[in-house]
Curated annotation (Swiss-Prot):
Entry's family note: Belongs to the three-finger toxin family. Short-chain subfamily. Type IA cytotoxin sub-subfamily.
Alphabetical UniProt keywords: Cardiotoxin, Cytolysis, Disulfide bond, Membrane, Secreted, Target cell membrane, Target membrane, Toxin
Keyword Coiled coil among UniProt keywords: no
General function of this protein: Shows cytolytic activity on many different cells by forming pore in lipid membranes. In vivo, increases heart rate or kills the animal by cardiac arrest. In addition, it binds to heparin with high affinity, interacts with Kv channel-interacting protein 1 (KCNIP1) in a calcium-independent manner, and binds to integrin alpha-V/beta-3 (ITGAV/ITGB3) with moderate affinity.
Tissue: Expressed by the venom gland.
Biological process terms in GO annotation: killing of cells of another organism
Official protein name in the record: Cytotoxin 1f
Subunit details: Monomer in solution; Homodimer and oligomer in the presence of negatively charged lipids forming a pore with a size ranging between 20 and 30 Angstroms.
Main location, first listed in the record: secreted
One GO term describing the cellular component: other organism cell membrane
Length: 15
């Protein structure tokens, strides 16, 4: 998944 700082669920995908 792409880095998504707007969605806590996807926030973990951010470096």
């Amino acid at each position: 998944l792409k880095c998504n700082k707007l969605v806590p669920l996807f926030y973990k995908t951010c470096p």
